[in-house]
Amino acid sequence: MHNVRVEKINEKADECRQNQNAATIEFKLEGEWRTSKDEKQFGGQLSFPNGELALDADFPSFLGGEGRAPSALAYCFFGAMSCYGSTFATQAAMANVNLKSLKISLSLSVDFRGAIGIGTFPPLKGFDFKVHVDSSASNDDIQKVKKLTDERCPAIWAMKNPVPFTTSAVKAL
């Protein structure tokens, strides 16, 4: 339904009832800072089941880059928007709510004063997702799908819950 293979989701759900790790995907990403001024500042490969994609990032000029590629945060925000939109489409299909089209927008602002050493400020002011749906379903059904999306979207979960992290830095020999 609307480019969501519900039967595959149902198969995986059945598998998860027997194996709690069946729906776990491990990610391992690598990238590199480029020191040549002729190159975009950061790059890496992103692997997915059917291939790889080369990605580059470059800060805007006021953060020391030249804006030759999206910033790292732009990728984060696109990922959050894509995750929410994809989860919405998936939840709609699972609820048998057909979508003729779905468009999503995300608005937010970032305060970079902390990043440039001016003080300690919360950098993010809030995410405003807007989903525009063309569907023959009732508004009540659309709102039920939105509620399921808010409950099940991994990006929303990550915004609501502190995610543990570790960092390390190792000097090359």
Where do the protein language model's features map onto the residues?
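Aromatic- and glycine-enriched beta-alpha-beta binding-site module
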Residues: 85, 89
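Extended beta-strand/beta-hairpin segments
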Residues: 1-78, 90-173
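Alpha-helical metal-binding/catalytic segments enriched in His/Glu/Asp
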Residues: 80-84
